[in-house]
């Protein structure tokens, strides 16, 4: 590993030789000199860098490499105005690979999938070939995919041949006439026929332009974020500007009027007189509901305390062991209920106003004359790991719902993390990008909801309701047919890849055998053994995981891969035409940026499962698009409400939104049986607990459907965070707080410390925190600035000026993608704080809860966004065994949290006490399983022994029991009232609480203790996702009985209680002096336990009617036999034989 540190100081190398031997990975690391070039069909190497990398990177102090591009007669630097137009086309058509001790390669792919693609943004899109003899390179194209032809004779020519022609006299190879214009930028702009964009700042490198937004904020504006400063007046009464895209008033004071002064002009007084409208509102629970709710909690706490005191004082001398066990369990249950109930004291609801969002960010204003979207960028993360358990069709539908979301196209980017590195997932994403060419414009034209094609075409409601366009029926029929063909292509991909690989493998074997025979003449030739590779559609080896795993091509050992499936869209709307199958006139046909990412995996490096994959996406997206906000989805969760992203952005862009670390959306599920047998909807958690936490510091992070602030993931403190420096005891021996000299507006970029040196974040330590990528480090202040709310009101602190985000997005170049390859390599996180303080936190099965806890612990807040129409929907395991394993994984993560430093006992003073109790309950709840199992056996032990937990059922005990039960029911009814759930959902949750508590939670505690005490690591298999292919029976998985050891405790509890009831009845009936009170008490509690386990018993029976009758007969006979045998062995007092006085009371 000695070469590792040396290699970390250099960026990955880039070349386009895709046929080089893969053994190069084992060679010594390359030098720090990196060449960015590609080879043309004529053998020339052409520079394709968009900026002068030497000048750009040389200005950074932390740079440990240099870039050398030696000029030759055939390789002269190209004019930036020409190269920028073609650079993204090259990037989107190239597959970038690289990693540890390997060269970063850009493999130019003329074909990504077997089918033809036509969208100009897509990789491998079909186009015309160069007409110059001996050249087959694609012709340059514009945003619409139309050919860029520099000569009036329309001779088709590629970029390289055009540059050759310009250098050799400027003559067109077709008509032999000189080119009238040799600048591609000019005729490209004429071909687009779009409005001119706001110009970038004059001069400066790409890095200067990238950081100029942040530089512009180092002005008096940032030092004046106080309530006494009028931002509107400063902006419109001075000639100064901050940020890009701002406008100031003309001398006549009118804006928006025509040349004659007529029109609806608006002056600064008109703007300042308009009332400021918030983006969100907090809706308090009615006092008629919440006040009795809190009063009942107080009453129940008092009654529980009195009851436990009475139970401790009044022992049962006849069965002291039974009394002791019951009291210990009741004490724990009281503590567990208290930890669960206290955080529910302050539930709230929230509402958003999308009209205000549109008015503030997408309406023409003096600071945004063109009305371009001023919303911040948003990077969407979709994670998948195994195409066998997570069907590619499900993942493709999720991608399509994201691409069709109602959010500015140029501000949206989608990153797909394929942690398995499978070619099947890669080609499925390419097929989805191709189908999006039709699906996304169709959704925009007809306002389709939901925008997941599989869910939309499976709707059981009338699809033509509220549709007024005459061509909707024709369009829907056409798109439905295309989607059916798309599904067939996706389903046939595994066989297609296998057949293709077999064909190429056979060809390679034949070539090798011919070569071997030629070299050895007539000698006996041994069979040639060639590794069976997986081949891509363009006839090259897949750099990821092969179907038949081999060295450097397995799930845990493969190179990093990045493919830009859809290149970034143009800044201006691109309207379709009436030609083709759909009339897309006045419909924007642009598609968001879509990137396939598979991080590098190598033996000896811990991959950290999903958390590691998410952190790799965070770094790659920071370099490629750097959206200040991130929303992550599991591959089986899709956008059900196309405006959900806007609703989440309302919270982030509202006043005080800069202190929000994330917006959590509730999880809603499809494909669950109508009775919700195993409480898959989990509505008590998502609609009761999460709403209650929203009234504190915010809900916990649940792993999917969460909108993050990027800098919160980076481990920064929130703006205006209160600093605490507790000593041994913060109450008595606290140290004095230093007075910070760091400006208030810059505190969001601090990671602790108060000195002037800390204001610069100790630049020498930055690589130790984030790694050695200067691109990544430079993107941090840009993301922080762009994520601020608008400074459109004096009360808005730490805001940004309106119109600052209307500038065009920078184009992707190969050097940027190469840097992204470097940051997803297996070695990048070595000796950094990724996973410990930055990004998703490692070390727990439930990395989501720990990640959210760390943010709240630093003082950030979160909000819960419940939309009228579900924001996201997904699938959940409806099979009993799968559900228990899911609960086991969650509970194991909680046990890990309890035994780690993430225990809420060690939370910082920034966390509120009730929020701390909520996180403490997250770590403690699995331990209830021990007491729950004991308590479930107590009724049976009572019936077996003829004793009860109390000596007699006196009035005091019954009154306490009645009050506790009534308060519990009333609290449940009030929770149902303010949360909106149903009584059946509440009861299903209670049932599964006992089922999970007696099975999965017990196993989780045992596994957690084994990990802590013995160091035994815990591994879980990926939960299989349903592909929705079983049309005949949607709930077929519900009836499948798959045995697991988790079923043993609940089955034992049921059997013991059933036998105990039979024994109790037999004992009482044959007793000389029947004690019916003890029997009734024991039978009542046994039936209460069995009622909770009813869904579990129903799941064991499988499909209704399929359980043989003989099973019930034998079960009854066994129960009767055991009960009679017990009575014979231990006869009732006063009876000498079975029989005797058989009398009813």
Curated annotation (Swiss-Prot):
Its main location: Golgi. SUPFAM superfamilies: RING/U-box. Signal peptide: none annotated. InterPro entries: Cellulose_synth, Nucleotide-diphossugar_trans, Znf_RING/FYVE/PHD. Gene3D superfamilies: Spore Coat Polysaccharide Biosynthesis Protein SpsA, Chain A, Zinc/RING finger domain, C3HC4 (zinc finger). It is an enzyme of class 2 (transferase). One of its GO terms (cellular component) is endosome. The active site is at 419, 848. Its EC number is 2.4.1.-. Residues 1-38, 189-208 are annotated as: Disordered. Keywords: Cell wall biogenesis/degradation, Glycosyltransferase, Golgi apparatus, Membrane, Phosphoprotein, Transferase, Transmembrane, Transmembrane helix. The keyword Glycosyltransferase applies. It is found in: Golgi apparatus membrane. Preferentially expressed in root hair cells. Expressed in roots, leaves, stems, flowers and siliques. GO terms for molecular function: cellulose synthase (UDP-forming) activity; mannan synthase activity. GO terms for biological process: cell wall organization; cellulose biosynthetic process; response to cold. Residues 1-19 have a biased composition (Polar residues). PANTHER family: X-BOX TRANSCRIPTION FACTOR-RELATED. Belongs to the glycosyltransferase 2 family. Plant cellulose synthase-like D subfamily. This is Cellulose synthase-like protein D3. It comes from Arabidopsis thaliana. The gene is CSLD3.
């Amino acid at each position: 590993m000695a070469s590792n540190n040396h290699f970390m100081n250099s960026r990955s190398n880039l070349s386009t030789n895709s046929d080089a031997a893969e053994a190069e990975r084992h060679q010594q690391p390359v030098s720090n000199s990196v060449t960015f070039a590609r080879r043309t069909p004529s053998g020339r190497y052409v520079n394709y860098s968009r900026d002068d990398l030497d000048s750009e990177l040389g200005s950074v102090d932390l740079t440990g490499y240099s870039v050398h591009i030696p000029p030759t007669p055939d390789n002269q630097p190209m004019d930036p105005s020409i190269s920028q137009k073609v650079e993204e086309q090259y990037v989107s058509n190239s597959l970038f690979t690289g990693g540890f001790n390997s060269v970063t390669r850009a493999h130019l792919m003329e074909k990504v999938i077997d089918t033809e693609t036509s969208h100009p943004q897509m990789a491998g899109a079909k186009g015309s070939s160069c007409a110059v003899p001996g050249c087959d390179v694609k012709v340059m194209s514009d945003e619409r995919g139309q050919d860029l032809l520099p000569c009036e004779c329309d001779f088709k020519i590629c970029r390289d041949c055009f540059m050759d022609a310009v250098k050799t006299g400027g003559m067109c190879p077709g008509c032999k006439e000189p080119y009238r214009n040799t600048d591609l930028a000019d005729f490209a702009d004429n071909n687009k026929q779009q409005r001119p964009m706001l110009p970038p700042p004059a001069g400066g490198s790409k890095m200067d332009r990238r950081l100029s937004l942040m530089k512009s904020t180092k002005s008096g504006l940032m030092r004046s974020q106080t309530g006494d400063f009028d931002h509107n007046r400063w902006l419109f009464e001075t000639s100064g500007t901050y940020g890009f895209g701002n406008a100031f008033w003309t001398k006549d004071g009118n804006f928006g009027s025509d040349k004659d002064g007529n029109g609806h002009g608006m002056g600064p007084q008109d703007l300042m007189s308009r009332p400021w409208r918030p983006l969100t509102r907090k809706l308090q629970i009615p006092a008629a509901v919440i006040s009795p709710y809190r009063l009942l909690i107080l009453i129940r706490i008092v009654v529980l305390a009195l009851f436990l005191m009475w139970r401790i004082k009044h022992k049962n001398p006849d069965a002291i062991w039974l009394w002791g066990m019951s009291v210990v369990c009741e004490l724990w249950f009281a503590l567990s209920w208290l930890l669960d109930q206290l955080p529910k004291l302050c539930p709230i609801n929230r509402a958003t106003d999308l009209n205000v969002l549109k008015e503030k960010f997408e309406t023409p204003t003096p600071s945004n004359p063109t009305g371009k979207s001023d919303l911040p960028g948003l990077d969407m993360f979709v994670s998948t790991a195994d195409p066998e358990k997570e069907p590619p069709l499900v993942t493709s539908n999720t991608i399509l719902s994201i691409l069709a979301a109602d959010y500015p196209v140029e501000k949206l980017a989608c990153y797909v993390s394929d942690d398995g590195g499978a070619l099947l997932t890669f080609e499925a994403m390419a097929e989805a990008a191709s189908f999006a060419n039709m699906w996304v414009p169709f959704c925009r034209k007809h306002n389709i909801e939901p925008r997941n094609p599989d869910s939309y075409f499976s709707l059981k409601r009338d699809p033509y309701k509220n549709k007024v366009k005459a061509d909707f029926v024709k369009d829907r029929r056409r798109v439905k047919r295309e989607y059916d063909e798309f599904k067939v292509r996706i389903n046939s991909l595994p066989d297609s890849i296998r057949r293709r690989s077999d064909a190429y493998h056979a060809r390679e074997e034949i070539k090798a055998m011919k070569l071997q025979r030629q070299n050895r003449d007539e000698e006996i030739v041994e069979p040639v053994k060639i590794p069976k590779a997986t081949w891509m559609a363009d006839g090259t080896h897949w750099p990821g995981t092969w179907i038949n795993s081999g060295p450097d091509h397995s799930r845990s050992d493969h190179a990093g891969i990045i493919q830009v499936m859809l290149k970034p869209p143009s800044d201006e709307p691109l309207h379709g035409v009436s030609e083709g199958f759909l009339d897309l006139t006045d419909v924007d046909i642009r598609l968001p940026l879509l990137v396939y990412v598979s991080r590098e995996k190598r033996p000896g490096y811990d991959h950290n499962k999903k958390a590691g994959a998410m952190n790799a996406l965070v770094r790659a997206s920071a370099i490629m698009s750097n959206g200040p906000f991130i929303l992550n989805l599991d591959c089986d969760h899709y956008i059900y409400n196309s405006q959900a992203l806007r609703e989440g952005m309302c919270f982030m862009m509202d006043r005080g939104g800069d202190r929000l670390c994330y917006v959590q959306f509730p999880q809603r599920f499809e494909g669950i049986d109508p009775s919700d047998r195993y409480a898959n909807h989990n509505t008590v958690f998502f609609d009761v607990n999460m709403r209650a936490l929203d009234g504190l510091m915010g809900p916990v992070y649940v792993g999917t459907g969460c909108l993050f602030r990027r800098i919160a993931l980076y481990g920064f403190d929130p703006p205006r965070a209160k600093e605490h420096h507790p000593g041994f005891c913060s109450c008595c021996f606290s140290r004095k707080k230093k007075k910070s000299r760091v400006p208030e507006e810059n505190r969001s970029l601090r990671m602790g410390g108060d000195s002037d040196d800390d204001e610069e974040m100790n630049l020498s330590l930055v690589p130790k925190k984030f790694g050695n990528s200067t691109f990544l480090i430079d993107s941090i202040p840009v993301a922080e600035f762009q994520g601020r709310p608008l400074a459109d009101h004096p009360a808005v602190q730490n805001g940004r000026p309106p119109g600052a985000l209307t500038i065009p997005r920078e184009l992707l170049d190969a050097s940027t993608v190469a840097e992204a390859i470097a940051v997803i390599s297996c070695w990048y996180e070595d000796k950094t704080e990724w996973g410990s303080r930055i990004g998703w936190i490692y070390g727990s099965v439930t990395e989501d809860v720990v990640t959210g806890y760390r943010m709240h612990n630093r003082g950030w807040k979160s909000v819960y966004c419940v939309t009228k129409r579900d924001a996201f929907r997904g699938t959940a395991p409806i099979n009993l065994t799968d559900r228990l394993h899911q609960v086991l994984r969650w509970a194991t993560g909680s046990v890990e949290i309890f035994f780690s430093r993430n225990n809420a006992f060690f939370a910082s003073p920034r966390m509120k006490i009730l929020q701390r109790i909520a996180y403490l309950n997250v770590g403690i709840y699995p331990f209830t399983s021990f007491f729950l199992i004991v308590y479930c056996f107590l009724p049976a032990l009572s019936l077996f022994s003829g004793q009860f937990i109390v000596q007699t059922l006196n009035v005091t005990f019954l009154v306490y029991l009645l009050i506790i039960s009534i308060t519990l029911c009333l609290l449940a009814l009030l929770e149902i009232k303010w949360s909106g759930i149903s009584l059946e959902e509440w009861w299903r949750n209670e049932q599964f609480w006992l089922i999970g508590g007696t099975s999965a939670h017990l196993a989780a505690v045992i596994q957690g203790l084994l990990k802590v005490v013995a160091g035994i690591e815990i591994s879980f298999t990926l939960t299989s996702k349903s592909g929705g292919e079983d049309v005949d029976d949607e709930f077929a998985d519900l009836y499948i009985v798959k045995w697991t050891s988790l079923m043993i405790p609940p089955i034992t509890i049921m059997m013991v209680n059933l036998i105990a009831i039979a024994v109790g009845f037999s004992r009482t009936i044959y007793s000389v002096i029947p004690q019916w009170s003890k029997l009734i008490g024991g039978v009542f509690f046994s039936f209460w336990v069995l009622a909770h386990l009813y869904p579990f018993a129903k799941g064991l029976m499988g499909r209704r009617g399929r359980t043989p009758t003989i099973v019930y007969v034998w079960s009854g006979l066994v129960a009767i036999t055991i009960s009679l045998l017990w009575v014979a062995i231990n006869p009732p007092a006063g009876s000498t034989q079975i029989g005797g006085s058989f009398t009813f009371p």
